[in-house]
């Protein structure tokens, strides 16, 4: 259990540009009535504050586990049972302060949950519905090497885990936790990536963005976790921030306001939004950069830190920055953005996405 990550409580949303940032005011939307996607964008800080207090009261201090970009965390049974999927480490840990039946139920529901996070409240204590098309199918196998795709297999696997893999640990508050650890298969990331290939192919054709770039960004942003949410309220597979990139995207779609969480938790809408934002970076904010490789490096860095921050690495004046970029070869642009960008996160981000993109170069 030492591998468990402890996530700090999010009592307020941190108001700064993170993943999928934007630098300019949005344009006015159409005067025609548009769907209202922004109803549930407020009050998240209150929700998270109450969530944190609930966990502290039941599990004790320093035991808060919270959903993040590459970690799915879901509490059930009035917060006495929880499941944690690390999509980065390829490991599932399901634990309870209640009885074995609660643990069995959580094992089954976790293994058979769907891929669409729309309408799923990760901060409530209810079970995620069982899906006929489980998201983890092909990523987890049972004791016989079978993919867990239905209730019968999941229940049989749960029985095996409870009889052979059950462990306990003691909390600082004196309570005993019972848990099981389920490893994912070695190529679990690749399996998840394949699930989204039809959508990525569709958005690539729609916006003229290379599939490998979309997939590389998805891997680095969320490890293909459709339930992803960051401390800066970036949401979904491509980690779109509603109030920045989301506003830019909606303005260009002719919508007012910004997308809400349910909109961005829909995989199709999220990949559409993230890919559209890449075109905004390419065609608007970074317009004028002539070399396609240099522009790609700038787009990747800007997706994380914002176009303004990228251009200021070269000059405070936008036109002068673009001129300087055009006077340098792509290798120099890469070196500068990975060494001179003031944000260490942005420096590392370009390295990671560029590396991840190479894996998907031959995907069509």
Curated annotation (Swiss-Prot):
One of its GO terms (biological process) is cell wall macromolecule catabolic process. One of its GO terms (molecular function) is peptidoglycan lytic transglycosylase activity. It catalyses: Exolytic cleavage of the (1->4)-beta-glycosidic linkage between N-acetylmuramic acid (MurNAc) and N-acetylglucosamine (GlcNAc) residues in peptidoglycan, from either the reducing or the non-reducing ends of the peptidoglycan chains, with concomitant formation of a 1,6-anhydrobond in the MurNAc residue. One of its GO terms (cellular component) is cell outer membrane. A lipid is attached at residue 20 (S-diacylglycerol cysteine). CDD domains: LT_MltC_MltE. Keywords: Cell outer membrane, Cell wall biogenesis/degradation, Lipoprotein, Lyase, Membrane, Palmitate, Signal. It comes from the Bacteria. It is found in: Cell outer membrane. The keyword Signal applies. HAMAP family: MltC. Belongs to the transglycosylase Slt family. This is Membrane-bound lytic murein transglycosylase C.
């Amino acid at each position: 259990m030492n591998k468990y990550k402890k996530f700090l409580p999010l009592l307020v949303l941190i108001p700064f540009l993170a993943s999928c940032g934007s630098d300019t005011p949005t344009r006015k939307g159409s005067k025609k009535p548009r769907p209202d996607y922004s109803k549930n964008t407020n009050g998240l800080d209150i929700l998270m504050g109450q969530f944190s207090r609930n966990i502290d009261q039941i599990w004790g201090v320093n035991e808060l586990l919270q959903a993040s970009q590459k970690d799915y965390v879901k509490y059930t049974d009035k917060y006495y049972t929880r499941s944690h999927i690390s999509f980065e480490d390829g490991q599932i840990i399901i634990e309870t302060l209640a009885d074995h039946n609660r643990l069995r139920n959580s094992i089954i529901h976790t293994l058979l949950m769907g891929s669409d996070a729309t309408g799923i409240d990760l901060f409530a204590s209810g079970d995620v519905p069982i899906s006929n098309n489980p998201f983890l199918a092909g990523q987890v196998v049972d004791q016989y090497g079978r993919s867990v795709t239905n209730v019968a297999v999941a229940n049989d696997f749960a029985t095996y885990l409870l009889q052979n893999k059950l462990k306990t640990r003691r909390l600082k508050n004196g309570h005993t936790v019972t848990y099981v650890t389920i490893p994912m298969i070695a190529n679990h990331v690749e399996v998840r990536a394949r699930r989204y290939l039809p959508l990525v192919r569709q958005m690539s054709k729609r916006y003229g963005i290379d599939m490998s770039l979309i997939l590389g960004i998805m891997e680095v942003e969320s490890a293909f976790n459709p339930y992803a949410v960051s401390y800066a309220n970036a949401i979904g597979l491509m980690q779109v921030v509603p109030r920045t990139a989301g506003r830019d995207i909606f303005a260009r779609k002719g919508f007012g306001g910004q997308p809400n969480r349910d909109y961005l938790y829909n995989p199709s809408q999220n990949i559409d939004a993230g890919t559209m934002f890449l075109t905004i970076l390419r065609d608007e904010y970074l317009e004028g950069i002539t070399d396609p490789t240099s522009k790609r490096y700038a787009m990747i860095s800007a997706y994380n830190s914002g176009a303004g921050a990228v251009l200021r690495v070269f000059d405070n004046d936008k036109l002068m920055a673009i001129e300087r970029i055009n006077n340098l070869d792509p290798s120099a642009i890469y070196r500068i953005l990975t060494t001179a960008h003031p944000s260490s996160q942005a420096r590392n981000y370009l390295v990671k996405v560029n590396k991840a993109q190479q894996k998907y170069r031959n995907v069509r």
